[in-house]
Amino acid sequence: MDTPPNVLSQQITDAVSKKGPVVRIGINEVAVTDTSLARTLYASFLKWPEWYESPKEKLFYGEPSLFGMTQPKEHSARRRILSNVFSKSLRSSTHVQNVTREILVERMIRQAQIPSGRSVVRDVRPVHEAFDMDFLTAFAFTPAFSTQFLNESDKFSEFRSWLRELRGGSPDAAKEAKCKLENWCLDMCRAYRASLTPTHQRISHCTADALYGAGLQESEVAAELLDHFITAKKNLAVVHTYSVYMLSIYTEVQERLRSELRSLSLDKLSIDDLASLPFFSAVISEVMRTHTEIKALTPRLVPAGGYWIPQRISGQSTFLPAGTVVSSAREALHLNEEIFPQPLSFWPERWLESADPKLAGKAQPQEMQNHLWYFGSGTHGCVAREYALYGETKLQFYMESAEL
């Protein structure tokens, strides 16, 4: 039986503390936990087909999404389309501003309001998952065609049950859940496409618009979007939930954050305004460092000719023959004591220029960002990095400014 990703990630983290930044974890497989080396390898090595490729019957609609594409030409073409959607300019996009106003302000904040004088115990994970789905489907299709999971808890519960069956149900139950998810996403795609008129003008940073505009078939569009929805539902909600959890525990961090946020106004607030707040940015970086949801190792293959790992990395030159599987565990990278002293401690101050040198590690705060490998790197790194940071930043601001 294969070792679960979370267990393997922890085993690698433990091994690194004893053996160094290059650890052999199989007959022809090594794990590297030096960030600069990982970036080099992930930028130049190919995906390992046996890990990424799925049988056609397991693919949504029988079509591969960007993540599962192993052929460079095919992957590059799809990535170009999505890179334009998820570029930094989304921060000033009118479409994204409309999505933020509708999903975050009109739906999320109202959902989170608690009557004055009442104390309420609430499971925030489902709320954050519902928010992420509403936000991402609105981003993909515009708010008019998004899910309404924040307001329709019964439909969201049904959606979550499909995902549970897909991942952990019997073969028959998983097959049925896959069919229901495909129909659900395809219905949204068709509804959005039916709304397009002959004079329709492309909407900047609207995912469905970009995919249809590039000439993709409806099944290809639906497969790509469904992969986005399922991935974001799991990963972003973890960051959001742990943000609330850690701030509830570390009340002094919460108070300092709110004090900084009070310097801004909700009116005409831009993402750049938030990015200029040092402690706000530090909190987000520390949450992503300490709570890495992505445990899978995303392996790569050493190409023909092999590769020499420099002596400066592991103390001796190490040759990796062609065909060697190379992986990196984000958790191990984020718990590197040389870069992040007391790595198990939640300490946002480490990211500030004014940090105590004894606790800041070898890297300066700006350099530390290079060691934050939450989104991976290279041509196969997370294409939606800017979207994820935007969503996390906006949600964190509204939750804290509203003192929820």
Curated annotation (Swiss-Prot):
GO terms for biological process: secondary metabolite biosynthetic process. Pathway: Secondary metabolite biosynthesis. Pfam families: p450. One of its GO terms (molecular function) is heme binding. Signal peptide: none annotated. Its cofactor is heme. The keyword ATP-binding does not apply. The keyword Iron applies. SUPFAM superfamilies: Cytochrome P450. Heme binds at residue 382. Gene3D superfamilies: Cytochrome P450. Keywords: Heme, Iron, Metal-binding, Monooxygenase, Oxidoreductase. Belongs to the cytochrome P450 family. Cytochrome P450 monooxygenase; part of the cluster that mediates the biosynthesis of a highly modified cyclo-arginine-tryptophan dipeptide (cRW). The first step of the pathway is perfornmed by the arginine-containing cyclodipeptide synthase (RCPDS) avaA that acts as the scaffold-generating enzyme and is responsible for formation of the cyclo-Arg-Trp (cRW) diketopiperazine. AvaB then acts as a multifunctional flavoenzyme that is responsible for generating the cyclo-Arg-formylkynurenine DKP, which can be deformylated by avaC. This is Cytochrome P450 monooxygenase avaI. It comes from Aspergillus versicolor.
